[in-house]
Amino acid sequence: MPAQTTNLFLLEDLEDVGRTSELAERDLHALHAVANWIRTYVVKPHQDLGRAGPVCPFVPEALERKTLWLAPEQIADRDVPDVVELINGYQRLFLDAQPTDGDDASYKVIVVVFTDLSAERAQGVFDDVLQHLAVPSYVEDGIVFGPFYEGHEGTAIYNSSFRPFQSPVPFLFVRHGVTGDWKFFLDDEDWLNLWARRFGESAVHALAEELRRLPWRVGRD
């Protein structure tokens, strides 16, 4: 568990009045909305996903290991530098959180839920914040951020008509980058280069494993 837990909640913590009694009603409602969305959508298969398995294969394992935390924040009146500093704080908290090594550490994720941010403003706020944080956080600490909000136009890897990044409340997740992230970087050469430098030989193996699954290889085996 992270050393600082007052503002971090496992999904099951939301049912504990003792843990949530000091939360503003807006914050508690937003956390419940995201938690329900995770339980009913993110960890389930979807017919439009284009592959088997849950919408996000990472999340069921994180829930099982109790390494996924929700954190409510109100930022409507804050400017971009303030939000950048806020997320920097969560990044430091994430890096210090137990576990810090082993398999469990690979499944840590903090979901920062912006409880008073409208969907209309979310894209602009996230774009501005990530312009400051995304590259240095990845290069220095291997951290990736994932923005979700209603109206997000990002599409699924295996189905360009399916938009899985649309959440009921805007949030930004913080997690370790993994070798499988290359699929999200294929259309961005700069990010693909950063990924290759970070993972080195493991990156080559990840691509080779994917190539082995292609039809031309299957036909030879």
Residue spans for each PLM region:
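Expand to "…catalyze enediolate/carbanion chemistry for C-C bond making/breaking, isomerization
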Residues: 2-221
